[in-house]
């Protein structure tokens, strides 16, 4: 009887851990810029510390104020299928990162479970 309870407990634990891991589609990731123009980091899974988010927001704000670049940073546990770079291009295109007249957008996507970071740059930053 005790072994049966132990096995059931283990199965419940593994099921709850699996349920916590979330794979995002591009349209599911919260765009923090819509709620607060001084925020540039979307960190729905809490991968980055609050201090890191605050520092990145500060640097991104300075880049935007100087009209150097408009930056968006996303850190998630995993994405739903596909290539990370293609996902990043789709995500940051949907969000409209960068000014159209100078194409100065920079999107940075960190996908923890795949151990990948992808940078998507507008043509104005490449030259």
Locations of the language-model features?
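Bacterial N-terminal signal peptides that target proteins for export
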Residues: 1-7
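Folded, non-transmembrane soluble domains that reside on the lumenal/extracytoplasmic side of membranes
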Residues: 22-127
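Hydrophobic h-region of N-terminal signal peptides that target proteins for export
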Residues: 8-20
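Helix-centric, low-specificity signal for extended rod-like, repetitive segments
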Residues: 1, 13-15, 105
């Amino acid at each position: 009887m005790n072994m049966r309870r132990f096995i059931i407990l283990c199965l419940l634990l593994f099921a709850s851990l699996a349920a916590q891991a979330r794979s995002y589609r591009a349209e599911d990731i919260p765009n923090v810029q819509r709620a607060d123009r001084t925020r540039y980091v979307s960190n729905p899974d809490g991968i980055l510390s609050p201090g890191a988010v605050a520092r990145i927001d500060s640097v991104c704000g300075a880049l935007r104020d100087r009209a150097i670049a408009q930056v968006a940073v996303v850190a998630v546990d995993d994405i739903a299928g596909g290539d990370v770079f293609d996902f990043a291009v789709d995500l940051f295109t949907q969000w409209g990162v960068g000014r159209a007249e100078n194409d100065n957008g920079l999107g940075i996507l960190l996908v923890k479970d795949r151990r990948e970071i992808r940078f998507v740059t507008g043509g104005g930053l490449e030259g």
